[in-house]
Amino acid sequence: MPRPKPRSPRRRGRPPPAAPPPPPARPRARRYRPGQRALREIRRYQSSTALLLRRQPFARVVREICLLFTRGVDYRWQAMALLALQEAAEAFLVHLLEDAYLCSLHARRVTLYPKDLQLARRLRGLQGEGF
C-alpha cells in the first residue's frame, strides 16, 4: 500500500480570536469565628451616640398613638419635640434591656428570654401590658 504524500496544513484565513481572559476570581469572604461579628457590633453601638431608631418610622408611631388618645384630633409635632421623645424612648429601652440582661445572668443564662423582660418591668414597677 503506498504511503500518502505529506501535505502542508490548510490555511483558513484568520485564526479565531482568542477567548477573553476569565474575570479575576473574587477573593473568598473572610470567615469570622462565631460571635466575633456580634462583639464588633456591640462595641460599635456602645461607642456611638447616634439614634438607633429611624426618625420617620418613630414619628409615625408617635402620631398614631397621639391619634388614639386624642379621639382623632391630629396634633402637630415640632421636630425638636419628636427628637426629645425619641431620645427618652431609646434611653428607656436600653436601660430596660440592660436590666433584663442582668436578670438572665442572675438565672445563669446568656440568652435573653421574654420572662427576663417581664421580671425587669415588674421590678421597676412598670404596669400595663397594652402599650
From Swiss-Prot:
<protein>
    <recommendedName>
        <fullName>Histone H3-like centromeric protein A</fullName>
    </recommendedName>
</protein>
<keyword id="KW-0137">Centromere</keyword>
<feature type="region of interest" description="H3-like">
    <location>
        <begin position="34"/>
        <end position="131"/>
    </location>
</feature>
<keyword id="KW-0238">DNA-binding</keyword>
<dbReference type="GO" id="GO:0000132">
    <property type="term" value="P:establishment of mitotic spindle orientation"/>
</dbReference>
<feature type="compositionally biased region" description="Basic residues">
    <location>
        <begin position="1"/>
        <end position="14"/>
    </location>
</feature>
<dbReference type="InterPro" id="IPR000164">
    <property type="entry name" value="Histone_H3/CENP-A"/>
</dbReference>
<dbReference type="GO" id="GO:0005654">
    <property type="term" value="C:nucleoplasm"/>
</dbReference>
<dbReference type="InterPro" id="IPR007125">
    <property type="entry name" value="Histone_H2A/H2B/H3"/>
</dbReference>
<comment type="function">
    <text>Histone H3-like nucleosomal protein that is specifically found in centromeric nucleosomes. Replaces conventional H3 in the nucleosome core of centromeric chromatin that serves as an assembly site for the inner kinetochore. The presence of CENPA subtly modifies the nucleosome structure and the way DNA is wrapped around the nucleosome and gives rise to protruding DNA ends that are less well-ordered and rigid compared to nucleosomes containing histone H3. May serve as an epigenetic mark that propagates centromere identity through replication and cell division.</text>
</comment>
<dbReference type="GO" id="GO:0051382">
    <property type="term" value="P:kinetochore assembly"/>
</dbReference>
<keyword id="KW-0539">Nucleus</keyword>
<dbReference type="GO" id="GO:0034080">
    <property type="term" value="P:CENP-A containing chromatin assembly"/>
</dbReference>
<dbReference type="GO" id="GO:0003677">
    <property type="term" value="F:DNA binding"/>
</dbReference>
<dbReference type="InterPro" id="IPR009072">
    <property type="entry name" value="Histone-fold"/>
</dbReference>
<dbReference type="Pfam" id="PF00125">
    <property type="entry name" value="Histone"/>
</dbReference>
<dbReference type="GO" id="GO:0046982">
    <property type="term" value="F:protein heterodimerization activity"/>
</dbReference>
<comment type="similarity">
    <text>Belongs to the histone H3 family.</text>
</comment>
<feature type="compositionally biased region" description="Pro residues">
    <location>
        <begin position="15"/>
        <end position="26"/>
    </location>
</feature>
<dbReference type="GO" id="GO:0043505">
    <property type="term" value="C:CENP-A containing nucleosome"/>
</dbReference>
<keyword id="KW-0158">Chromosome</keyword>
<dbReference type="GO" id="GO:0000779">
    <property type="term" value="C:condensed chromosome, centromeric region"/>
</dbReference>
<dbReference type="GO" id="GO:0000281">
    <property type="term" value="P:mitotic cytokinesis"/>
</dbReference>
<dbReference type="GO" id="GO:0071459">
    <property type="term" value="P:protein localization to chromosome, centromeric region"/>
</dbReference>
<feature type="region of interest" description="Disordered">
    <location>
        <begin position="1"/>
        <end position="33"/>
    </location>
</feature>
<dbReference type="GO" id="GO:0030527">
    <property type="term" value="F:structural constituent of chromatin"/>
</dbReference>
<keyword id="KW-0544">Nucleosome core</keyword>
<comment type="subunit">
    <text>Component of centromeric nucleosomes, where DNA is wrapped around a histone octamer core. The octamer contains two molecules each of H2A, H2B, CENPA and H4 assembled in one CENPA-H4 heterotetramer and two H2A-H2B heterodimers. CENPA modulates the DNA-binding characteristics of nucleosomes so that protruding DNA ends have higher flexibility than in nucleosomes containing conventional histone H3.</text>
</comment>
